[in-house]
Amino acid sequence: LIPNDQLRSI
């Protein structure tokens, strides 16, 4: 799965 860092693309 993708790390939360990827979701932190805000």
UniProtKB/Swiss-Prot annotation:
Ranges annotated as spanning the membrane: none
Q: Does the keyword Secreted apply?
A: yes
Top-rank taxon of the source lineage equals: Eukaryota
Q: Where does the secretion signal sit in this chain?
A: none
Species in which this protein is naturally found: Tityus obscurus (Amazonian scorpion)
Further information: The primary structure of this cryptide Pep-3 is identical to that of cryptide Pep-3 from other Tityus species (AC P69940, AC Q5G8A6, AC P0C2F3).
Protein name, UniProt field: Cryptide Pep-3
**Biological role stated in the UniProt entry:** Does not induce hemolytic activity, lactate dehydrogenase (LDH) release from mast cells, mast cell degranulation, and antimicrobial effects. In vivo, injection into mice causes moderate edema formation, but induces very weak or no change in nociceptive sensibility. It also reduces mice locomotion, suggesting an increase in anxiety, but causes no alteration in rearing (standing on hind limbs).
Secreted as a keyword?
yes
Its lineage opens with: Eukaryota, Metazoa, Ecdysozoa, Arthropoda, Chelicerata
The principal localisation class reads: secreted
Keyword annotations for this protein?
Secreted
